[in-house]
């Protein structure tokens, strides 16, 4: 998992250490008018790499309303555009989780795991404010969309699905 902000002083250095498609994607997203973009899923091609841009208007909710998720074919680049904050928790895929809903063979490329109380001991946590991004690789189980102690908040977020194969 990688965390950063497209507006901070170190953005160029942070982006430069990423695989080429992710670096290009961050620069592209930073230059787009995402606040006024239509919601939905859109195909996007950068340097010959086919990606999927998802633009969503959502509301955060408590941790127990979410299930841990993972992807295998895509790297998830999640960027908070406005609103929030949006809390993400994450932990490594150690192969011990119980599958609740496997949709890896669908275009959504998503698998949900059962919530387990013991994962709370190993979950990392980041709080996304506008401009913050989190990048999740296939080994990063993540739980986005959570509210902070102040309760549910509306937010707009981007999820850009970048093929893992393009990042190798």
Positions of PLM-derived features:
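A short, N-terminal "cap"/entry segment at the start of jelly-roll beta-barrel domains
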Residues: 1-55, 65-70
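Non-heme Fe(II)/2-oxoglutarate
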Residues: 2-5, 64-66, 76-78, 87, ...
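Conserved short histidine dyad/triad with adjacent acidic residue
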Residues: 53-71, 81, 85-98, 138
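Short, conserved beta-strand element in jelly-roll/cupin
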Residues: 72-86, 92-94, 103-118, 161-162
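Short, structured patches in soluble enzyme cores that scaffold and shape functional sites
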Residues: 79-81, 138-140, 146, 160-164
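Short, solvent-exposed loop/turn positions at domain surfaces
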Residues: 122-123
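Conserved metal-binding segment of the jelly-roll/cupin
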Residues: 126-147
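A short hydrophobic beta-strand segment most commonly corresponding to one strand
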Residues: 133-135, 151-168
């Amino acid at each position: 998992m990688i965390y950063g902000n497209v507006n901070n002083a170190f953005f160029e250095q942070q982006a430069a250490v990423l695989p080429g498609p992710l670096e290009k994607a961050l620069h592209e997203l930073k230059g787009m008018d995402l606040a006024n973009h239509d919601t939905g899923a859109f195909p996007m091609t950068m340097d010959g790499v086919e990606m999927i841009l998802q633009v969503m208007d959502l509301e955060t909710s408590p941790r127990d309303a979410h299930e841990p998720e993972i992807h295998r074919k895509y790297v998830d680049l999640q960027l908070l555009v406005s609103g929030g904050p949006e809390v993400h928790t994450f932990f490594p895929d150690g192969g011990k989780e119980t599958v609740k809903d496997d949709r890896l063979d669908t275009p959504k490329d998503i698998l949900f795991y059962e919530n387990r109380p013991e994962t709370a001991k190993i979950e990392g946590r980041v709080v996304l404010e506008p401009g913050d991004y989190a990048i999740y690789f296939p080994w990063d189980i993540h739980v986005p969309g959570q509210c902070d102690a102040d309760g549910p908040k509306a937010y707009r977020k981007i999820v850009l699905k970048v093929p893992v194969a393009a990042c190798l």
